[in-house]
């Protein structure tokens, strides 16, 4: 096998990967033209969540820290809007990224409350509790490390419920604390729940990548439990519904680079559930174990809500395995070390593009012994071609005998016929792992390189990098000796750089840059190896 056939194999593997990616990724149907009714903060669930009735609109209060801007509805105390102040909506925009949203076109909310026999969110009440706050807006002041938003509701029986949101400087994790003061003469049975509700169809203003097969990523629910560290649960999976009991874990809604998640913190078993709601919406949530609060006593119930970017180290500190929401696909065990190395290099270099170039040199340097072995094996195979051709003419159509004598020849000449494949087998997972890393790491979102490349996670707007990549492939092809004699294979190999260029037109520019640098390193290593092979009589500069 020579380098020409290796390119053909790469193309086959590449096409296979893209077809698999298209099949594996949950592709939700395009947004319908049906208008979603103005969303209320109703929590309409199945038997698992017991449901909460629809209700009128409460007062909207605003909460702002250095990294978050939230809108909370006093009717139920749900988070209806969330802007991430450190992340622009699109490249070059002054508008912050809009994660949670409640509009006529799209609904994405983080809901929480107390259901159960005596819960204020029990459907039998007819409406959700209307909390009272001391002010309409809250903002983290300079020098302040923590912001508390207390909301109070007093039920008809005199029981006081205080729901407090606690936000910290620089943190995307919110503590949601319930303090229940049972001043009634009867015990209370309450169940804490947290739910993430989202419209299944994306409106045009939020659909930023579904038309690009190379940039399409997972959007849907996920959870972690005692049995599964990380499991996706797509909108289509919700037709069957999730209903499990676990002593640990979290539930989440995911999209590229960003996530929301409820992490139960109350001791005891929790029920995780999903459901399809009305108006084309779906939900994933948790229900804590019921608690009994005796008459005249007080008790606290709480949970943690993550609303923000998928920053691995910060998410891991909030809950075990929450960092796995950074979706690196089935090659996560390669992507994660690659990202750690890339982040380490970025700490010294200060530019993600140059860090990718540096990691390319490191990877190709580590693989140089295998690359050298590959070219040596291919050179020996080329020298055996006359003997193999004579063997074919002598043996004819007896395939079994031909195979036996070929293996005997390889053994006597100390040639491994698969020796040229090993570097390819290793390079392809690294290439695909880098693809997942670029598509899943929020640190690379809108990361500039130089000149016209302002976002390494997006395609080259002028297609210059894919064309340069095709040129480097062409030079590698022209400089590589070949034993391909079949006219069809020769024609395929001639068009291979063009085919790859077309494929890479829509790929992240950071990935294309990696491939360009890798090709340039290949050209340098190729010339160095060929000089050594010439001295051993295993290579000639004349291309046959």
Curated annotation (Swiss-Prot):
Keywords assigned: Cell inner membrane, Cell membrane, Chaperone, Membrane, Protein transport, Transmembrane, Transmembrane helix, Transport
PANTHER family for this protein: CYTOCHROME C OXIDASE ASSEMBLY PROTEIN COX18, MITOCHONDRIAL, OXA1
Keyword Transmembrane helix set for record: yes
Transmembrane segments: 6-26, 343-363, 418-438, 456-476, 497-517
Name of the featured protein: Membrane protein insertase YidC
Gene: yidC
Membrane topology according to the record: Multi-pass membrane protein
GO cellular component: plasma membrane
Family affiliation: Belongs to the OXA1/ALB3/YidC family. Type 1 subfamily.
Localization: Cell inner membrane
Gene3D superfamilies given in the database record: 2.70.98.90
Oligomer and partners: Interacts with the Sec translocase complex via SecD. Specifically interacts with transmembrane segments of nascent integral membrane proteins during membrane integration.
Species in which this protein is naturally found: Pectobacterium atrosepticum (strain SCRI 1043 / ATCC BAA-672) (Erwinia carotovora subsp. atroseptica)
Broad class of the protein's primary localization: membrane
Top-level lineage group: Bacteria
UniProt cross-references to InterPro entries, sorted A to Z: Membr_insert_YidC, Membr_insert_YidC_N, YidC/ALB3/OXA1/COX18, YidC/Oxa/ALB_C, YidC_ALB_C, YidC_periplasmic_sf
Known role: Required for the insertion and/or proper folding and/or complex formation of integral membrane proteins into the membrane. Involved in integration of membrane proteins that insert both dependently and independently of the Sec translocase complex, as well as at least some lipoproteins. Aids folding of multispanning membrane proteins.
HAMAP family: YidC_type1
Biological process terms in GO annotation: protein insertion into membrane; protein transport
GO terms assigned for molecular function: membrane insertase activity
Pfam family, one: 60KD_IMP
């Amino acid at each position: 096998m020579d380098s020409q056939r290796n390119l053909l194999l790469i193309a086959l593997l590449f096409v296979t990967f893209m077809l698999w990616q298209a099949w594996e990724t949950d592709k939700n149907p395009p947004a319908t033209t049906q208008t979603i009714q103005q969303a209320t903060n109703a929590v309409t669930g199945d038997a698992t969540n017991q449901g909460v009735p629809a209700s009128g609109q409460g007062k909207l209060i605003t909460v702002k820290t250095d990294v978050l801007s939230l809108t909370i509805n006093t009717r139920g105390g749900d988070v209806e809007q969330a802007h991430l102040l450190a992340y622009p909506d699109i490249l070059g925009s002054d508008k912050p990224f809009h994660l949670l949203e409640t509009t006529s076109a799209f609904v994405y909310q983080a809901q929480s409350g107390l259901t159960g026999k005596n819960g204020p969110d029990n459907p039998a009440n007819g409406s959700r509790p209307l909390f009272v706050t001391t002010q309409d807006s809250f903002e983290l002041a300079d020098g302040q490390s923590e912001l508390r938003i207390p909301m109070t509701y007093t039920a008809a029986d005199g029981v006081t419920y205080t729901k407090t949101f606690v936000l910290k400087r620089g943190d995307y994790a919110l503590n949601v604390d319930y303090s229940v003061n049972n001043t009634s003469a009867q015990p209370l049975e309450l169940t804490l729940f947290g739910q993430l509700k989202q419209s299944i169809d994306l409106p045009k203003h939020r659909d930023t990548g579904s038309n690009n097969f190379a940039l399409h990523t997972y959007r849907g629910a996920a959870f972690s439990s005692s049995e599964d560290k990380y499991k996706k649960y797509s909108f289509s999976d919700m037709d069957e519904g999730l209903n499990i009991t676990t002593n640990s874990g979290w539930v989440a809604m995911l999209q590229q680079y960003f996530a929301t998640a409820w992490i139960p913190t109350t001791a005891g078993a929790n029920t995780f559930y999903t459901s399809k709601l009305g108006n084309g919406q779906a939900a994933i949530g948790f229900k804590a174990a019921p608690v009994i609060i005796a008459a005249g006593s007080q008790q606290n119930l709480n949970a943690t809500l993550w609303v923000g970017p998928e920053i691995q180290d910060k998410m891991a500190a909030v809950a075990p395995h929450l960092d796995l929401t950074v979706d690196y696909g089935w090659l996560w065990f390669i992507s994660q070390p690659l990202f750690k190395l890339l982040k380490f290099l970025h700490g010294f270099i200060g530019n993600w593009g140059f860090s990718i170039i540096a990691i390319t040199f490191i990877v190709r340097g580590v693989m140089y012994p295998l690359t050298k072995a590959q070219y040596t094996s291919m050179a020996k195979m080329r020298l055996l071609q006359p003997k193999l051709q004579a063997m074919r003419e002598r043996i004819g159509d007896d395939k079994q005998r031909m195979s036996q004598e070929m293996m005997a020849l390889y053994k006597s000449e100390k040639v491994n016929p698969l020796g040229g494949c090993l570097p390819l087998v290793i390079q392809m997972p690294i290439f695909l792992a880098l693809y997942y890393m670029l598509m899943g790491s929020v640190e690379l979102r809108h990361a500039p390189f130089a000149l016209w490349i302002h976002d390494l996670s997006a395609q080259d707007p002028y297609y210059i990098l894919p064309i340069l990549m095709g040129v480097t492939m062409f030079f590698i092809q022209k400089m590589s000796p070949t034993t391909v004699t079949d006219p069809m294979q020769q024609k395929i190999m001639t068009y291979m750089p063009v085919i790859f260029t077309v494929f890479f037109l829509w790929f992240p520019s950071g990935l294309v840059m990696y491939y360009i640098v890798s090709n340039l390193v290949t050209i340098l290593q190729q010339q160095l190896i060929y000089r050594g092979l010439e001295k051993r009589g295993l290579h000639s500069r004349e291309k046959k």
